[in-house]
Amino acid sequence: MADSKGEDLATAILKRKDRPNRLIVEEAQNDDNSVVSLSQAKMDELQLFRGDTVILKGKRRKETVCIVLSDDTCPDEKIRMNRVVRNNLCVHLSDVVSVQSCPDVKYGKRVRILPIDESTEGVTGNLFEIYLKPYFLEAYRPIHMGDNFIVRAAMRPIEFKVVLTDPEPYCIVAPETVIFCDGDPIKREEEEESLNAVGYDDIGGCRKQLAQIKEMVELPLRHPSLFKAIGVKPPRGILMYGPPGTGKTLIARAVANETGAFFFLINGPEIMSKLAGESESNLRKAFEEAEKNSPAIIFIDEIDAIAPKRDKTHGEVERRIVSQLLTLMDGMKKSSHLIVMAATNRPNSIDPALRRFGRFDREIDIGIPDATGRLEVLRIHTKNMKLHDDVDLEQIAAESHGHVGADLASLCSEAALQQIREKMDLIDLEDDKIDAEVLASLAVTMENFRYAMTKSSPSALRETVVEVPNTTWTDIGGLESVKKELQELVQYPVEHPDKFLKFGMQPSRGVLFYGPPGCGKTLLAKAIANECQANFISVKGPELLTMWFGESEANVRDIFDKARSAAPCVLFFDELDSIAKARGGNVGDAGGAADRVINQILTEMDGMGAKKNVFIIGATNRPDIIDPAILRPGRLDQLIYIPLPDDKSREAILKANLRKSPLAKEVDLTYIAKVTQGFSGADLTEICQRACKLAIRQAIEAEIRREKERAENQNSAMDMDEDDPVPEITSAHFEEAMKFARRSVSDNDIRKYEMFAQTLQQSRGFGQNFRFPGQTGNTSGSGNNLPVNSPGDNGDDDLYS
């Protein structure tokens, strides 16, 4: 209970308080730019009369003034306004606005109103006489500085903007008010820039972090008296860190727009100067400028560029800048309403002196969003997109593991581009205008999103090639028990995390496949990553080792970091024996680099966060030389022996290999499976490939022969068009291929694996006959059941029984 209460307190600042003057926006019945409608009961409650002027407050500190009228059909908690008023308040339908009486509104002496250039194209004549004069004469209209409004006359609407009012910021335009409308029209681009300013509702996927930032920034800037009353200093700085593309800079801009504070942006590298002392003076100027315009927010983007660790930097300038930043942050006056925000994606390379309380008080991790966060981000990016009915955003959010906000934005634009490509045959690029029907038919479908998903990969993993492989269970013949165990290991924690919570258990972390070469160990790892739609990072053992001291361990760290940031993720170590040999025996190998790599892998496996679904699969055909520390439970806790296939498995492998090939009916795969005892999966694949090759060779030779015959007797060329000479792979091809068939694994090797499996079985499976006292009767049947992966029982591999 305490936990849920804590949750509530953490995001309490985001909850909107209920007040009688907070109303939900609804579409207006009459299309008047200066009128809003309320129910009579709500007007009585707010002590408003019909025709009163009210001030409305919307999002991003936007406000406007209107005349209020009563409307009996309007529900009590709603307010009706048309699109013009909504745009002036930056709100949409069903958003919330606050209404207050505005008794101090005066008649205006002078107002300046300019048209917006786009809407006046092709219009000549006096705009004032045709548009503005009739608009303001018909009613006493209240206007607010910065408002836009549309006037319809002479067959076409024109949009105007209120540039100045006297008195500021709002007044009523009466008959004696002087209206100036001289000057150049306002450019639409400038207008849209202010409209497209970012607000809190444009940020998704970091609700908790936003709550922390709001209480750190909005409370000191808006209500410093709160801190005075309690007797503590308001916080001074916030450091936001996290991977690129999660929205750190976006949050800073949104905070500035929503608080209405002066926003001063410092891009880290821009401060640097070649002249001595100038870099520090640039920093001082920025702080002075912000203090003059308080309340203000200083935002330092990429702070690691100007405040690196002083003991690590060689340049004197960087050290001086760090010292200057420290003294500036300490010297900020108590009274000045100034907050410093900084963003970086390398928090550990910042000087530690900056990270103490009183400078950057709070460090906020803006991490990779979860499925709910991704859904929020997708909704924000698709709110202006035309989507087809079949688009399921929840499905896309669930499948886009490891994507940050920037990746999701690119996903949406890629899907939209794909939709345009599909309609390309209807669009003529030479034409000036595109047919309205084509534009109307554009709608992004789920298929477009599916295509975009194949093209986009999480930005955290761009440099390591992460692919979700396209191998499925059908590509793997046999090994049913192993497949089942793998599904339990990887698919269950990803798809049914609630069950693990219910039974209070953490899913196991890793598996080691061992067995003779060519039995499908690598193939299994690929298939499991594909089946549960997890990201898949394949680590080739020898690639991790480099000639530089300490670099090999850093490579291991990086790979694990990337896997964690793209969870759920399968890390596949192929040829594990090359990097995880038993320690102590590696004398004279680059100063014990291999030992250090193993130590790093061990610590990374232990330190893998409990909440991250990262699975490790190792594959080796030399399990005897692997360090025993890696094989303990909690690291690679499940050792799965992948034996040579038995009769049924061999038949399944042959079928899997030949499932796309045309096969003659007389080819008896069961018989081939029976005679190929001791063959591995790779050997069987080789037989199939050789049979296919022989069929292809025969088909090509027949074609060449036919061409020659055709050239010799051209007259009867038409009659010679008979059937395909080699329509399918016949038994003759297989008989020929079997002459070259060979076993790649000797009996001797297999005995080694069997021995290793046996010793493991004995060392681990000592409790096969374990019973609780007094319960012998209940479980007598299951007493002799070995685990599915016990290679000791002959049922699993009857090759040499």
UniProtKB/Swiss-Prot annotation:
Its main location: cytoplasm. Present in the mushroom bodies of the protocerebrum and in the glomeruli of the antennal lobe. Present in nurse cells, oocytes and sperm bundles (at protein level). ATP 2 binds at residues 518-523. It is an enzyme of class 3 (hydrolase). Disulfide bonds: none annotated. The keyword Nucleotide-binding applies. It catalyses: ATP + H2O = ADP + phosphate + H(+). The modification Phosphoserine is found at residue 716. Residues 764-801 are annotated as: Disordered. Its EC number is 3.6.4.6. GO terms for molecular function: ATP binding; ATP hydrolysis activity; polyubiquitin modification-dependent protein binding; protein sequestering activity. ATP 1 binds at residues 244-250, 345, 381. One of its GO terms (biological process) is negative regulation of smoothened signaling pathway. It is found in: Cytoplasm; Nucleus; Cytoplasm, Cytoplasmic ribonucleoprotein granule. InterPro entries: AAA+_ATPase, AAA_ATPase_CDC48, AAA_ATPase_domain, AAA_lid_3, Asp_de-COase-like_dom_sf, ATPase_AAA_core, ATPase_AAA_CS, Cdc48_dom2. Residues 776-785 have a biased composition (Low complexity). Changing residue 437 to A: In ter94-26-8; arrests early in oogenesis. GO terms for cellular component: autolysosome; cytoplasm; cytosol; fusome; lysosomal membrane; nuclear membrane; nucleus; P granule. The keyword Lyase does not apply. Keywords: ATP-binding, Cytoplasm, Developmental protein, Differentiation, Hydrolase, Nucleotide-binding, Nucleus, Oogenesis, Phosphoprotein, Transport, Ubl conjugation pathway. Necessary for the fragmentation of Golgi stacks during mitosis and for their reassembly after mitosis. Involved in the formation of the transitional endoplasmic reticulum (tER). The transfer of membranes from the endoplasmic reticulum to the Golgi apparatus occurs via 50-70 nm transition vesicles which derive from part-rough, part-smooth transitional elements of the endoplasmic reticulum (tER). Vesicle budding from the tER is an ATP-dependent process. Involved in the ubiquitin-proteasome system. Important for oskar mRNA localization and/or anchoring during oogenesis. Homohexamer. Interacts with tud, vas, papi and AGO3. Interacts with Npl4. This is Transitional endoplasmic reticulum ATPase TER94. It comes from Drosophila melanogaster. The lineage of its organism: Eukaryota, Metazoa, Ecdysozoa, Arthropoda, Hexapoda.
